[in-house]
């Protein structure tokens, strides 16, 4: 398996942040973005990859390693913001907040995908960036673990939806629970199939 590396970062100079989001598709919960900067590219953390390719246990281990050596910022767009705007605008908002929470002046921002937020720094959009750039891949891990932990906390308040397991995604079990119990304030009211209930 080919792992992301610093090849993209090494074509640029200065302070470079990788940004990725998680939680665009679920029916419940916020969208979370993370921004990660490796100030010392000689630091090697084996196994960093797109978070979707990793087991939950592996993500947890890598999260602890990444956050102990890298600078990182977390940004969130709430369910209210997702309902008020749309998921694309809410995602961009969460990315901006993650970058702002770094509290650093940057030279470049590497963003996974092709719809980056408008920020004051130079931005490079990279499709499949979480499989190419180690900074973006690390951001995907930090964002995923952060959101998963949040959904597990929300599960304790609303166990009937089993968010501990499905993390708010539209599984058959989650949809069945919505049919039985209705929706909570944590559900995205403008997402199908909730919108048509």
Curated annotation (Swiss-Prot):
A Pfam match: RNase_HII
Primary site of residence: cytoplasm
EC numbers: 3.1.26.4
Catalytic activity: Endonucleolytic cleavage to 5'-phosphomonoester
UniProt KW keywords: Cytoplasm, Endonuclease, Hydrolase, Manganese, Metal-binding, Nuclease
GO function terms (MF aspect): manganese ion binding; RNA binding; RNA-DNA hybrid ribonuclease activity
Record has Hydrolase as a keyword: yes
GO cellular component, one term: cytoplasm
Subcellular location: Cytoplasm
RNase H type-2 domain segment(s): 14-197
Biological process, per Gene Ontology: DNA replication, removal of RNA primer; mismatch repair
Family label: Belongs to the RNase HII family.
HAMAP family (alphabetical): RNase_HII_B
NCBIfam families xref list: PRK00015.1-1 (NF000594), PRK00015.1-3 (NF000595)
Function as written in the Swiss-Prot or TrEMBL entry: Endonuclease that specifically degrades the RNA of RNA-DNA hybrids.
The protein's name in its UniProt record: Ribonuclease HII
Organism: Wolbachia pipientis subsp. Culex pipiens (strain wPip)
Taxonomic lineage from the root: Bacteria, Pseudomonadati, Pseudomonadota, Alphaproteobacteria, Rickettsiales
Gene label: rnhB
């Amino acid at each position: 398996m080919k792992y992301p590396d610093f090849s993209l970062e090494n074509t640029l100079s200065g302070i470079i942040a990788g940004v990725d989001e998680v939680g665009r598709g679920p029916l419940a919960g916020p969208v979370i973005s993370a921004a990660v900067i490796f100030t010392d590219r000689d630091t090697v953390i084996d196994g960093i990859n797109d978070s979707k390719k990793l087991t939950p246990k592996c993500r947890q281990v890598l999260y602890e390693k990444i956050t102990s050596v890298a600078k990182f910022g977390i940004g969130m767009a709430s369910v209210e913001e997702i309902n008020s705007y749309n998921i694309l605008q809410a995602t961009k908002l969460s990315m901006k907040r993650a970058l702002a929470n770094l509290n650093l002046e940057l030279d470049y921002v590497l963003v996974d995908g092709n719809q980056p937020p408008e920020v004051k720094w130079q931005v490079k959009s990279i499709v499949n960036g979480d499989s190419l750039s180690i900074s973006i891949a690390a951001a995907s891990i930090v964002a995923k673990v952060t959101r998963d932990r949040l959904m597990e906390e929300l599960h304790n308040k609303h166990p009937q939806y089993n968010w501990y397991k499905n993390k708010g995604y539209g599984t058959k079990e989650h949809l069945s629970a919505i049919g039985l119990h209705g929706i909570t304030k944590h559900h995205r009211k403008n997402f199908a199939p909730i919108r048509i209930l």
